Each structure stands twice: as structure tokens, then as C-alpha cells.
Amino acid sequence: SAAYTMFVNSGIYSKPRTYLRVTDSSGNVILDNGYEGKVAISEETASLMTMLMETVPRTGGTAASLEFDRKYDIDVAGKTGSAGDYFDRWFIGYTPYYICGVWYGYEYPKHITDIATNPCLKVWDAVMGKIHEDKVISKLRPGEEFLEFNVSSNLVQCTFCKDSGLLMTDACKLDGRGNRAETGWFVKGTEPIGYCDKHVLVDYDSVEGAIACEWCPPENITQVALVKVDRKFPIEVA
């Protein structure tokens, strides 16, 4: 769970601590357990990892049965896990406020069977729901809003062709498989700048189901995009 601190803290790892400081009755600090943290990954990588793990609790994800985010409308990211032969189950998840890791298993490993969903999710829901109660109460006050996950200012969003990885052209939208657009985040300076060189527009005979030739009736011809596949062979092929 401690490793996940770098995702929510813009790439800075913070070691777990059971206390921050101890003071006497006059407020004098007797023990100080402050920790500055260490840079483990870049801010951009931390943001991208959080974006990826935000999909896990959503519909279709391995933690889709998690109720916390739908109940409280607080940002959640995390990852489920399981050991070989389902001896152990995990869920480590975090919000902009706290990180919580849950392990489910036996002291002496044995198969965990007859469980439709990851049991760690219910425990995580209960624990995180309780410790976020003060945040939910604060949200009811005028002007108060929940914290949200930070997105690095050095990231840009870009739409590209999923076949070439380059910027879209009109041909990409005429692929027989449907629109080939994909949207992703990139570190500034690494986003695609060239245009797709894989899709090629051709005249297509919709009746014959093949590339049109000069004898095809004009009324049967439409334009479609085919993907140009570069083949490289170790030797010259005749």
C-alpha cells in the first residue's frame, strides 16, 4: 500500500507512519516524525497511472462492484489482485485523501472458492466510507468541494489513429471496421505530430465486395480506406 503514495502525491513516495508528532500539554514538540518524502517517479507518470487505475472501479473493471465512488462521488483509483490458485485476494485503492489496502486470505494458504466477487472490495468500501465521513459532512457546507486527483500540467490529450499511432485523417474514419480514433494522454513533446500513413483511400465496389476496376458500374462504387501493411522479409522474395 505504501508504494501507492507516489501515485497520489505527484510521484513522491511517503513511508507509512503511525504518528506525525507528539507534544506536551503546552504544545511543545517532544517527538517529531516528519518525513519529506522521496521522488520515485515523475509527476507525469503518477498522473497517467492514476488515470489508468481510475478505470478499475468503473463498469467492466475488476473492481466494478465497488460502491464507494458511486455513493460519495469522490475520485477513486486502485487495483485488484490475486495469487496463484486464488490463495489470496487484494484490493489497494486510494482517493485524494487516503490510501487503503485490503488482503483477504488464510494464515496457512488455502483455496478461496465460491466467491463471485473480490471480498476485499466490501471491506474497502466499509473502511473508506467511515474515514471519509468528515469529508462528506464538509461537502454539505456552502463552497466546500471534494478534492480531485491532480492531472500534471505537462500532459496533453490527443486524438490519434489507433492503427498508425499518428494524427487522424479523413481516411481513418472510412475504415471498414469503423472509426479508428483513439484518445490518449501524452507528455508534452511526445504527442504525435505527423498524419496517419497507414490508411489509403480506394474505390470499392459495394456489390462485388472488392476493390473496383475500370469496368465496375459507377453507381456501385464508393470510397473506403484500407490499411497499408508493410512487409519486411529477411531475403528478397521473387
Name the predicted role of every residue range.
Residues 1-205:
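A penicillin-recognizing enzyme superfamily signal
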Residues 194-238:
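C-terminal functional modules
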